[in-house]
Amino acid sequence: MSPGIVSQEVNGRQEPTEAARDERHGRRRRVAVIGAGLVGSLAALNFARMGNHVDLYEYREDIRQALVVQGRSINLALSQRGRKALAAVGLEQEVLATAIPMRGRMLHDVRGNSSVVLYDPINNQCLYSVGRRQLNEVLLNACDKLPNIRCHFEHKLTSANLREGSMEFRNPAKEAVAAHADLIVGCDGAFSSVRQNNVRLPGFNYSQEYIETGYLELCIPSKSGDFQMPANYLHIWPRNTFMMIALPNQDKSFTVTLSMPFEIFAGIQNQNDLLEFFKLNFRDALPLIGEQQLIKDFFKTRPQFLVSIKCRPYHYADKALILGDAAHAMVPYYGQGMNAGMEDVTLLTDILAKQLPLDETLALFTESRWQDAFAICDLAMYNYVEMRDLTKRWTFRLRKWLDTLLFRLFPGWIPLYNSVSFSSMPYRQCIANRKWQDQLLKRIFGATFLAAIVTGGAIYAQRFL
């Protein structure tokens, strides 16, 4: 049994052990987790496995009963940090059983040609395309197996007093419901209601940045019961200032995300504009999507905004904590939003296992996490530039080839993407490694260039002077 995990299976249900019941001088904490998405349900599961009473609140209906899930991308890229968090609660293999491995990027140029850039040619590691709904259902089903978790769907947080641990919700009948908790954990997304309470507290630092790029989701359907493109890749159509990506789904379709500056979206006024734009920029994707389906999907909704949020501290005394997007929302271009949020839970669980006083535990979490959270927010911004533009440049291909060669020769030379996606190395250390590698390569190339000049000069002098 992992350190700090104090539950056991009894008659098919997870029951807290006696050690859990004795925690905190003979009583368990009552924890309120706000938000039953991926991070919230995972956090609830971990708190309950440590013996706490958990109330899990979600303002939407139970995703397992929803006919249509609105507002969020339907598939995600699961990497090592998320896998580690799922493995800790015994769910990794269940999730991977229905996930689709993506071994690299397949790049599509404007002429319709494609080429492959593998993520990890050395160890053959890959990302996994997972359905948001399916993953959320797996986590919620695991929560249902624990008797000390109570789920409250369609309960919207309307107010909270963090000092007192009191909350008020609006239930489906539009009635006010009062609740109390020893610890309030906000996992309620980029526009977190819990974080809004933190903003009003002294010493809380907060910044947000909207980028000038929006996104729309389209779909490449299956054909004759199969994928229309190779399934085991993240497909990218890089076009300098904009791009399109596609991830495979279990039903043999692809979820397509078109990311462009809002001014380009605004320039597409009608069906003819749209079709001409796709014929010019995405000629190979147009017949896969289908003209009529493209028109329907493109004009049925407006482009969505993307925001990057940084804040600190993540806690208030021993009363409240924020995790996931509530603490560090990021643009989706490194595929780390979900993975970073799940890693929050892993780190918090490890610190809780130290059994420090709760105020020290939460303070240690903030101190241990904020620099890494800031780092991945910055990396996500950078990767958007890389995906839409740099991936099609020869310099990017050269650096990728060089990183792969050096990684093969010197295992300690871990490329940036590998360290972020295929390890649990702290994000700030990933950046520090990249800076060190850049400096070393500059020195090597500088010395090589200088040696070439000196050698060339010497040869010239011998021959002509």
UniProtKB/Swiss-Prot annotation:
Question: Single GO molecular-function term?
Answer: FAD binding
Q: In which pathway does it act?
A: Cofactor biosynthesis; NAD(+) biosynthesis; quinolinate from L-kynurenine: step 1/3
Q: How does it sit in the membrane?
A: Multi-pass membrane protein
Location comes to: Mitochondrion; Membrane
Task: Indicate the secretion signal residues.
Answer: none
Q: Which residue intervals are annotated with compositional bias (Basic and acidic residues) in the record?
A: 15-25
The protein's predominant localisation is mitochondrion
Any matching Pfam family: FAD_binding_3
User: Which EC class is this protein assigned?
Assistant: oxidoreductase
Q: Identify the GO cellular component terms for this protein.
A: mitochondrial outer membrane
User: Which residues does the annotated region (Disordered) include?
Assistant: 1-26
Q: Which reaction does it catalyse?
A: L-kynurenine + NADPH + O2 + H(+) = 3-hydroxy-L-kynurenine + NADP(+) + H2O
The EC number(s) attached to this protein equal 1.14.13.9
GO BP term (any one): quinolinate biosynthetic process
Q: Where are the transmembrane segments?
A: 405-427, 440-462
Q: Which UniProt keywords apply?
A: FAD, Flavoprotein, Membrane, Mitochondrion, Monooxygenase, NADP, Oxidoreductase, Pyridine nucleotide biosynthesis, Transmembrane, Transmembrane helix
Top-level taxon of origin: Eukaryota
User: Required co-factor?
Assistant: FAD
Q: Which InterPro entries match?
A: FAD-bd, FAD/NAD-bd_sf, Kynurenine_monooxygenase
Q: PANTHER family from the entry?
A: KYNURENINE 3-MONOOXYGENASE
- Family affiliation: Belongs to the aromatic-ring hydroxylase family. KMO subfamily.
Stated role: Catalyzes the hydroxylation of L-kynurenine (L-Kyn) to form 3-hydroxy-L-kynurenine (L-3OHKyn). Required for synthesis of quinolinic acid.
Q: Which HAMAP family match?
A: Kynurenine_monooxygenase
Q: What is this protein called?
A: Kynurenine 3-monooxygenase
Q: Which organism is it from?
A: Drosophila melanogaster
